A protein has these predicted regions:
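N-terminal membrane-anchoring/stem segments of glycan-assembly enzymes
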Residues: 1-40, 370-377, 402-415, 440
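Acidic donor-binding segment of Leloir-type glycosyltransferases
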Residues: 62-111
């Protein structure tokens, strides 16, 4: 049996060149948006979902209370029916600082996933804003920004001040900040995740911001309340495994612009064990495939330029790159065992000998070299120069986790399993302006 892998070579090369183009675009980095004199900063409401987070929630709230922001800031921490001391720790901070509120969900309400928590808080804030609640200073939906920080998140001290001017443009619905891993120095696994986040931020997201296709993450996400209101009573879909990616795509479809701010970051705790990492990445892959349903609407979305729409569709589609690489590797192993014969006319136009070897080497090493250069330049934990080759190989080996998680995701999809987010239809959680005043 003979297998022709010419198509796989061309596909992989196109992907490499596409990301190389994004890297070139990202080299020109505009300065942060700045506010004109006299401009009133929006009211920032930082929402922190928390379920059994007693180990980290206290430090997170302390971090948020210490942020420098000339405008008004409120902190709404949602205890999702925790069974540990999370609620008590939040209540201590609420008693010390009037900007902090505790929203407690009952056992019947809790445990339905992050999307349900965010929707509960959203309805509470929306109704309070429409009612002119004094805790929100009477601000309207266009002047309120709903920020999401995970229970282990740490914003930089000036994050709110840096992000606020991005909302001067009334067409901007959401802004995402960069993500770092604050325990990157604790383990090699955590460092690999830091490389992923920093690399994605500075290699992809900056370029995507320039062409109008910035993506949203689940941590360090800032969204205008008025934009959320255009998505209905539950902006975060309960059935979405990657609710952040889904939300950003629907905002663009609704005509809003999404931005990316690389001038500040949110730090989060990296996973230090393989099992939860595999589970997390499997969910990401499966959620990515779920978002393919957005492709027809994105192709004609009003909230992005032609280049932005092309990038969004391409970004969603390129998740199949892992499948192509997996098939190529499987064929190569089968060939080495003598089961099949592999042929390929890829690079047949390049002269044999040294030119072919150089071309193959460049195509093989260009992605990794670009990624390592980006990380070294922008990381707060850069490697010593003599460590770079070793950890480049380690990162290459680590990247095979995507092959494993893609296989797991495909298995779950074939079995129609979407078990990370509970989706029983039990009705929405009631919220009112009056209830916001009672939360303390």
């Amino acid at each position: 049996m003979t297998i022709d892998l010419t198509w796989a070579g061309w596909f992989t090369s196109i992907v490499v060149l596409y990301y190389a183009a994004l890297f070139v675009v990202s080299l020109r980095r505009p300065g942060a948006d700045t506010a004109p004199p006299g401009w009133e900063s929006p009211l920032m409401i930082v929402v922190v979902p928390a379920r059994n987070e007693e180990q980290v929630i206290g430090d997170t709230i302390t971090n948020l209370r210490g942020l420098d922001y000339a405008g008004a800031c409120r902190i709404l921490v949602v205890d999702d029916a925790s069974t540990d001391t999370t609620a008590a720790l939040i209540a201590e901070h609420a008693a010390q600082d009037p900007r902090v509120r505790l929203l407690s969900r009952t056992a019947e309400q809790g445990g339905r996933g992050k999307s349900d928590v965010l929707n509960h808080a959203y309805r509470l804030i929306r109704d309070a804003a429409l009612a002119g609640d004094p805790w929100l200073e009477g601000r309207g939906p266009s002047d309120i920004v709903y920020a999401i920080v995970d229970a282990d998140g740490r914003l930089e001290k000036d994050s709110l001040s840096v992000v606020a001017p991005y909302f001067i443009d009334s067409s901007v619905g959401s802004t995402q900040v960069g993500v770092r891993i604050y325990n990157a120095g604790d383990s090699t696994l955590a460092r690999m995740q830091d490389m992923e986040f920093v690399g994605f931020t500075y290699l992809v997201q900056i370029a995507r911001d320039r062409i109008g296709s910035s993506g949203l993450g689940g941590n360090g996400q800032f969204t205008r309340l008025a934009a959320l209101m255009t998505l209905g009573d539950s902006p975060w879909k309960m059935t979405a495994l990657t609710e952040d990616l889904d939300l950003g795509l629907r905002l663009i479809e609704a005509g809003w612009r999404t931005r990316f701010c690389h001038h500040t970051t949110v730090a989060q705790q990296g996973l230090t064990k393989w099992r939860p990492l595999l589970r997390q990445r499997t969910r990401w892959i499966q959620g990515h495939y779920q978002c393919w349903s957005h492709i027809p609407r994105l192709a004609r979305a009003k909230g992005a330029s032609l280049a932005g729409r092309f990038d969004l569709v391409t970004y969603l589609f390129l998740v199949v790159t892992v499948v192509v690489i997996s098939l190529s590797m499987t064929a190569s192993v089968a060939s080495s065992l003598g089961f099949v014969k592999i042929t390929s006319s890829f690079l047949s136009f390049v002269p044999q000998g040294l030119p072919l070897r150089i071309t193959s080497l460049v195509l093989s090493l260009l992605p990794l070299a670009t990624f390592m250069l980006t990380y070294q330049k922008n990381s707060r934990h850069p490697y010593k120069w003599w460590e770079v080759p070793t950890f480049a190989l380690v990162f290459s080996a680590y990247s095979y986790v995507w092959i494993v998680t893609t296989a797991r995701a495909w298995t779950r999809m074939l079995l129609r399993r979407n078990g990370w987010v509970k989706t029983p239809r039990v009705g929405t959680v009631a919220a009112s302006a009056a209830s916001l005043e009672l939360v303390s």
